[in-house]
Design a protein with these regions (language model features):
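Walker B catalytic acidic pair
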Residues: 87
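Active-site-proximal or metal-binding-adjacent scaffold patches in catalytic folds
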Residues: 1-82, 91-143
Length: 143
């Protein structure tokens, strides 16, 4: 007798498996990308942790410890880079003041456009995504 793929039990098992795979991918790729961007733009941070966050994509503590939501992996790379650069700028400016936004937009001129798009995504499992290479160069249009 086969398993009903539409049963609640099967759906929960599939969701658990998807989350585990997503987390494993995030634990590999996000720290690598963060280190690459930090080096490129001369930021220093203390540590990076990848885990599930309930309502945000990332955070940076006063000690420059960066935490990233593993659901970032479902976003296009432009948005992932937006979040990573945002957290790196917090290593220089903790609050979202004028200096923060000037520094952020000096690195990512299309930040406002990407931020608007990012607000349409949620910090949970997204059924499908289209991502380009992590080496994609942002264009003037931002996407």
């Amino acid at each position: 007798q086969g398993v009903d793929a539409f049963s609640k039990q099967a759906q929960l098992a599939a969701e658990r498996g998807a989350k585990k795979a997503l987390k494993l991918e995030a634990e590999t790729l996000l720290p690598q990308r963060l280190h690459s961007l930090a080096s490129k733009y001369e930021f220093k941070f203390n540590s990076v942790q990848v885990r599930q966050l309930s309502s945000k994509w990332g955070s940076c503590s006063q000690n420059h410890d960066i935490t990233l939501n593993y659901y970032l992996m479902q976003l296009p790379w432009q948005m992932i880079d937006y979040v990573l650069i945002h957290e790196l700028v917090h290593t220089e400016f903790l609050s979202h003041g004028k200096d923060f936004w000037q520094r952020f937009e000096s690195i990512l001129p299309e930040a406002k456009k990407i931020r608007k798009l990012l607000k349409t995504y949620r910090t949970e499992v997204i059924s499908s995504t289209l991502r380009s290479s992590p080496n994609t160069v942002l264009t003037e249009d931002g996407l």
